Curated annotation (Swiss-Prot):
Alphabetical list of PANTHER family matching this protein: CYCLIN (PTHR10026)
Composition bias type Polar residues, residue spans: 282-298, 352-365
Gene name, Swiss-Prot/TrEMBL: CYCT1-3
GO molecular function: cyclin-dependent protein serine/threonine kinase activator activity
Keyword set, alphabetical order: Cell cycle, Cell division, Cyclin
Name by which UniProt lists this protein: Cyclin-T1-3
Cross-referenced SUPFAM superfamilies: Cyclin-like
Gene Ontology terms: biological process: cell division; positive regulation of DNA-templated transcription, elongation; positive regulation of transcription by RNA polymerase II
Secreted in keyword set: no
InterPro entries the UniProt entry points to: Cyclin-like_dom, Cyclin-like_sf, Cyclin/Ssn8, Cyclin_N
Protein family according to the UniProt entry: Belongs to the cyclin family. Cyclin T subfamily.
Length: 490
């Protein structure tokens, strides 16, 4: 692990010479915590401190995805919930919003963020475990690394680095450790919809997980991201979302059509960057929710616009991860869109970033035409049957319990043949839950240090309990933080 830049930090949470010069006010915008963490996409991309140090946008995007993959691997090996992994990723995104990649090793900072996230989410892991596993992942191509980190001198050096890094991260974040994720609003909304709940929740969940690799959490509020994930998941599964009654479905999220369109487009961009040609005649064999590839994009509009909503069909294929192909979006009825209940398309940001122009939504993907929700249902049924007598003893559950149970265990779809797996090796890891984590060890040698192969890694779905999160932003011992900072600079 490399060193950490500390000279640009201040105890107010503002980096000297940072483009984000607004004083850090935890209670900006009517007392809403964390309001200062939202910026427009243009601000994030053009004012990055990394850009000033010679790191272009493409390189920075690669580094962002790299530490996200590293954190996913680290979190699974530490056996922490997906919510903890997501919190660590958000901490990392926020850190590099105010610090440069050129002056801070991404994997060292990521390790610190995982250690910190474990405590924030009340799923702490021993510092020793975090250090050992992180070191092994970083030096996975070095057979001697496992034994080297067990040497007292090497271990103490890494321990000191992580503890130093923790102070730097806390100072850079302004001791604001409060993070909210899209998972809760996503599940609550789907419970209200009562349409294909299990499959829709799982696919949308996968979109949220993959969206962590982008800067969406720095632009949009959690419920806006949840709306975008449900929008894409419904298109992938060809599920009709509620469009009658007092509200159309997207109004449940207090999101405008412009915000919904922008979130959806940015999620799709993630898959376009891993574009590969879809395999011929594999429509039925590779169905599922999966992060794979996007072929092309055409134009369209989000719900509530004057034109017909998008029908993203050229988006991904196989594996249960997150990027599904989309077809047959059932949008709100025109009369609903023109009624007084329609959300006006204004430029109000509401704490999110909206650009005047942005990529349009996509349409028709040949590889996804044969995908339907029956395949997903069949996969669920197959998994239940595979559990044998144990499954037969499970009591009948209500819809809410079933959704949460399915999200915990994931939806296992039909496996691809080796050829298809190979063609998708460069895409984002599978997003389904894996209970035993043993597959994590099977990393391919051609992946970048700290990154995973699609065939060897899967996501864990967050645990949907009602555990009350501690409000970590209060009383974080500011005096100690200032004292530590002075020691670092002395």
């Amino acid at each position: 692990m490399d060193g950490i830049q500390t000279s640009d930090s201040s105890h107010h949470g503002i980096v000297e010479n940072s483009p984000y010069r607004t004083p850090y006010d935890r209670y900006a915008e009517g007392g809403q915590l964390g309001a200062s963490w939202y910026f427009s996409r243009k601000e994030i991309e053009e004012n990055s401190l990394s850009r000033r140090d010679g790191i272009d946008l493409k390189k920075e995007s690669y580094l962002r995805k790299s530490y996200c993959t590293f954190l996913q691997d680290l979190g699974m090996r530490l056996k922490v919930p997906q919510v903890t992994i997501a919190t660590a990723i958000v901490f990392c995104h926020r850190f590099f919003l105010r610090q440069s990649h050129a002056k801070n090793d991404r994997r060292t900072i990521a390790t610190v963020c995982m250690f910190l996230a474990g405590k924030v989410e009340e799923t702490p892991r021993p510092l020793k475990d975090v250090i050992l596993i992180s070191y092994e992942i970083i030096h996975k191509k070095d057979a001697a690394a496992v034994q080297r980190i067990k040497q007292k001198e090497v271990y103490e050096q890494q321990k000191e680095l992580i503890l130093l890094g923790e102070r730097v991260v806390l100072v850079t974040l302004g001791f604001d450790l409060n993070v909210h994720h899209p998972y809760k609003p996503l599940v609550e909304a789907i419970k209200k919809f009562k349409v294909a709940q299990n499959a829709l929740a799982q696919v949308a969940w996968n979109f949220v997980n993959d969206g962590l690799r982008t800067s969406l959490c720095l632009q949009f509020k959690p419920h806006h991201i949840a709306a975008g994930a449900i929008f894409l998941a419904a298109k992938f599964l060809k599920v009709k979302l509620p469009s009658d009654g007092e509200k159309v479905w997207w109004q449940e999220f207090d999101v405008t059509p412009r915000q919904l369109e922008e979130v959806s487009n940015q999620m799709l961009e993630l898959y376009e960057q891993n574009r590969v040609a879809p395999p011929p005649s594999q429509g039925n064999d590779t169905e599922g929710s999966s992060a794979s590839v996007v072929n092309q994009r055409a134009s369209g509009k989000a719900p509530g616009s004057s034109e017909e909503p998008p029908t993203h069909e050229n988006h991904l294929a196989p594996r249960q991860s997150s990027t599904p192909g989309h077809q047959g979006y059932d949008h709100p009825h025109p009369e609903k869109q023109n009624s007084s209940q329609r959300v006006p398309q204004n430029d109000a940001r509401d704490g999110t970033a909206n650009s005047n122009e942005g990529p349009n939504m996509s349409s028709t993907m040949d590889a996804m035409k044969k995908i339907d929700k029956d395949k997903v249902k069949a996969a669920l049924e197959k998994r239940r049957k595979s559990k044998g007598d144990v499954a037969k003893k499970v009591d009948i559950m209500d819809d809410d319990d079933l959704i949460e149970r399915e999200l915990e265990h994931g939806v296992e779809l039909a496996a691809e043949d080796e050829k298809i797996k190979h063609e998708r090796r460069q895409s984002w890891p599978h997003s389904a839950h894996r209970e035993d984590h043993q597959g994590v060890a099977r990393l391919t040698e051609n992946t970048e240090e700290g990154e995973l192969s699609i065939d060897s890694q899967e996501y864990r779905s967050p645990e949907l309990d009602n555990r009350k999160r501690k409000d970590m932003h209060e009383h974080r011992n500011y005096d100690r933080g200032e004292r530590d900072l002075k020691r670092l600079r002395s």
